[in-house]
UniProtKB/Swiss-Prot annotation:
This is Profilin-2. InterPro entries: PFN (IPR048278), PFN_euk (IPR005455), PFN_sf (IPR036140), Profilin_CS (IPR027310). It comes from Olea europaea. Keywords: Actin-binding, Allergen, Cytoplasm, Cytoskeleton, Disulfide bond, Phosphoprotein. Signal peptide: none annotated. Phosphorylated by MAP kinases.
Length: 134
């Protein structure tokens, strides 16, 4: 399966039990900042934004004072899992980032998708990739 198929079929799919509800954007990005696959709607990010995200995984709490920035959008960092998941909120939407052995799985959502639904979609794929040694 190609990386693009993971994004299209496992991240940008309908939310289970909520036909027509799906993430706004999603991507799988290598920990070096190289894009493995992304939805057409995923924002163009700056290297320093990806560096900040990687620093927060290595030093949890790094982004809390300044917020998480991706594609010029600022998200308020909310409760995540230190070293494993970063979550951010902006208005009625937000972002979930799951770290795997080699990559970061991104999901961005807006209402009617809920934070919990985004977390479920992103973390399920992230956990699968971890199980596969990726």
């Amino acid at each position: 399966m190609s990386w693009q198929a993971y994004v299209d079929d496992h991240l940008m799919c309908d939310i289970e039990g909520h036909e027509g509800h799906r993430l706004t954007a999603a991507a799988i990005v290598g920990q070096d900042g190289s894009v493995w696959a992304q939805s057409a709607t995923f924002p163009q990010f700056k290297p320093e934004e990806m560096n900040g995200i990687m620093t927060d995984f290595n030093e949890p709490g790094h982004l809390a004072p300044t917020g998480l920035h991706l594609g010029g959008t600022k998200y308020m960092v909310i409760q995540g899992e230190a070293g494993a998941v970063i979550r951010g909120k902006k208005g009625s939407g937000g972002i979930t980032i799951k770290k795997t052995g080699q990559a970061l799985v991104f999901g961005i959502y807006e209402e009617p998708v809920t934070p919990g639904q985004c977390n479920m979609v992103v973390e399920r794929l992230g956990d699968y990739l971890i199980e596969q040694g990726l």
